[in-house]
């Protein structure tokens, strides 16, 4: 059987706890008590000498102690029935045939129902506000810049841009080999500009810089005066 001593009756100080001092009957009728439906059921069972009460007995106890519930009975009575059915701390006890008069089964506390004590603090049957638990931070994923590899952090884009030209000159894998030199029979266009025939055949780019004598004769200096060692290097 459930030990009713765990729920001292003197903790149900209805008149003092439910309403402010000096409250009128009208205020009590309009003010909803600060008790949950589970607490109201527990109070009704606790006040019974046998430790059990019928559903109608629960209704009578609530309306007798709390005038607020005397109106709109259908709504809160449905809530009482739902809490009795869904809460494992309340069990239904059938009537004994031939020995008890009346209708309906009894309701009492389930044996070893210590979890009901956790619903209230120090015998206080008032409503408890829901406490918000600490926010749990999910596992942090890789940042937008890319995950850090085992070899170390990746270099910033600016550094990669500076290193790209140097690494290209070192012969990265997959690059094509350098072009082979032109055969000796064909002169490279760059070498052609420095040949003697090209210099003699091209017009003078700076005719104003010629000496007066050469400008009048329209001739070029002799080839032996030209430093040919520039083309033999």
Swiss-Prot record:
Q: Which GO terms describe its cellular component?
A: nucleus
PROSITE patterns attached to this UniProt entry: FORK_HEAD_2 (PS00658), FORK_HEAD_3 (PS50039)
Matching entries from InterPro entries are given as:
Fork_head_dom (IPR001766), FOX_domain-containing (IPR050211), TF_fork_head_CS_2 (IPR030456), WH-like_DNA-bd_sf (IPR036388), WH_DNA-bd_sf (IPR036390)
- Membrane-spanning intervals of the chain: none
Entry coiled-coil feature ranges: none
| Pro residues: bias regions | 175-184
DNA-binding region boundaries: 32-130
Q: Which UniProt keywords apply?
A: DNA-binding, Nucleus, Transcription
List the residue ranges of the region (Disordered): 125-198
Which residue windows does the record flag with biased composition (Basic and acidic residues)? Answer: 185-194
Q: Please describe what this protein does.
A: Probable transcriptional regulator.
The molecule here is called Forkhead box protein L3
């Amino acid at each position: 059987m459930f030990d009713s001593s765990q729920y001292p009756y003197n903790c149900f100080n209805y008149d003092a706890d439910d309403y402010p001092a000096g409250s009128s009957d009208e205020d009590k009728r309009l003010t909803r008590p600060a008790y949950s439906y589970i607490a109201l059921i527990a109070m009704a069972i606790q006040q019974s000498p046998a430790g059990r009460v019928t559903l109608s007995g629960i209704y009578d106890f609530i309306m007798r102690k709390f005038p607020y519930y005397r109106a709109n009975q259908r709504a809160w009575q449905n809530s009482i029935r739902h809490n009795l059915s869904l809460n494992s701390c309340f069990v239904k006890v059938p009537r004994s045939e031939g020995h008890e008069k009346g209708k309906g089964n009894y309701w009492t506390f389930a044996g070893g129902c210590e979890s009901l004590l956790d619903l209230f603090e120090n015998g206080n049957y008032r409503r408890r506000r829901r406490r918000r638990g600490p926010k749990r931070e999910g596992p942090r994923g890789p940042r937008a810049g890319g995950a850090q590899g085992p070899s170390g952090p990746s270099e910033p884009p600016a550094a990669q841009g500076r290193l790209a030209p140097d690494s290209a000159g070192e012969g990265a894998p997959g690059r094509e080999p350098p072009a082979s030199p032109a055969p000796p029979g064909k002169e490279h266009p760059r070498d052609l500009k420095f040949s003697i025939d090209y210099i003699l055949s091209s017009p003078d780019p700076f005719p104003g810089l010629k000496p007066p004598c050469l400008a009048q004769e329209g001739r070029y200096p002799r080839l032996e005066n030209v430093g040919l060692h520039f083309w033999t290097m």
